[in-house]
């Protein structure tokens, strides 16, 4: 009987601790000083690359305009990332066409090849980056470095869509870099691409959220 009482007391204690911790977290979220971490997403120009397809082929197969393929891919992935996070400590903001100035966008360099790409902000003026982030009420910049369309014939005909990305803080420090991919049988039109890339985009968001939670 004593052991049973002790067990119940122990369980009640841990439940109480868990409840207090949960309430404390909620109180923090509701407090005047609470601010969800906001991440501005920007896709680079001419960042759709492939080991097989060229822009004319992509345009013909997908119905996209050849001169806006990069914009279409960037928009779809950015919007999927943002839509995958309904609430919580992070919010993703897809940048619009005028939100990121040329002094920032045009100075971002991409290093690496194929699926292993990462961005370099060393040439970006720090004050310009901070101005862009402040205007968007954002704390971090997520750069979609490249969409690499990797085609393979063997063992199965498969198209890998590999999205590489880099996360920076306001001081141009790299916080995280990585990539994620999804597969399909052929090039897809924008509507199908949006659907096919949802799970992969959600994984990018969850990886970034986990990284920022560890800071």
Model-assigned labels for residue ranges:
Residues 8-12:
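Sec-dependent signal peptide hydrophobic core
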Residues 17, 142-143:
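Conserved short hydrophobic patches within well-ordered secondary structure
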Residues 25-53, 132-137, 148-215:
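C-terminal/domain-edge helix-coil "capping" segments
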Residues 13-22:
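Hydrophobic h-region of N-terminal signal peptides that target proteins for export
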Residues 54-141, 177:
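N-terminal segment of the mature soluble domain
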Residues 44, 96-98, 145-147:
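Short, well-ordered beta-to-alpha junction loops that form the rim of enzyme active sites
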Residues 1-6:
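Short, small-residue-biased leader/transition segments that mark boundaries at the very start
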